[in-house]
Amino acid sequence: MLSLVLIFMSVQLRLVGSEDTVASLLRHQAALASMGNRRHYQPAQPLLTGSRLSGHGWPRKVLGLYVLLADDTEKGFESDAVWTPELYDWQKSAANVLFFTFIHPATMEIPPAFVSLAASRGTNKNGAVPADTLIIFAIGGYAYSLDPNPWHWLLSREAAERMAEKVATWPATFGCDGVDLDLEEGAGQHPEAGRNLIHFIRRLKQLQPGLIVSQPAYGYPQVPAETEVINASWDTEGHSNNLADSVGLMVYYSTFALNYVKNYAQGASQWEGFPVTVNVPTNKILLGAHGQTSSADIHLLATETLRQDLLGIMVWYASVKNGFQYASSWDASTNNDSIQGYLQAMSLFRG
């Protein structure tokens, strides 16, 4: 049913001329795509692990999986639940980046599941993270942008910078290589959120210059805080201002993400009043992919990534071996065709 709705919407997007209508349809698509998607979580016990921060940033080409590790609505997998996640073998081979989902923005505490899986990196134990795989901690998400709203640490510059000082300790304490700032509708529309998120990133980069900061965004830019971060992170020539390191397109159906690259790569040359006013370098843009995207569509996303010199592909979502699921039809881990597609894409990226 979801696929039929999205197909219908895709046809509509080709027909409508109104930007308001396009924005409305994309908002609805994003809501559908976030079924079970961005949900609730909570705290954890700190555990000292090694950091891999080297200042080198993203791999040349990324295949990143959003893996489900904590959700306060899933019994036994709440943010404070103590359990030991294990990766599938295919995830270790197909991905060079893992996005751990999600940290609750009200607490900004690290779930024990994050700590456990991050600490496994390079140990070669069953289900462990490979030594050369990057770990990105995702903050917020769709549900956590609706509640809490606003995020308390984005209400002032002082609060944002204090939170940056806390987050700057995460690489050494928990072993992450970056953060994914998934501030969506709701808290992302709060009038002070964008400028204070910029203060947060700037302070974070002062303290941890090598920390990766990824900024997800809808295909059509419609969350003001996300757009403010993107506009502050680059200029019209594509030069970096040392804030966000990438933009991830939250367009997950088929290969549709390719249709929205121009909204960011050529933002400065869109129509007058367009929300994005800068040109994001193509090699800083990640294409969104539904977990169960067909291998043929994954191949097209991968070849276009190479042809257009895009950063890579981010996949929503993949369950871990002993974890939980949202809608099974979105789970990459239960579709052999998709798994083969991601393995082949990584082979292409590695050359």
Regions found by a protein language model. Name each.
Residues 41, 51-52, 351:
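Extracellular/luminal ectodomains of metazoan preproproteins built from arrays
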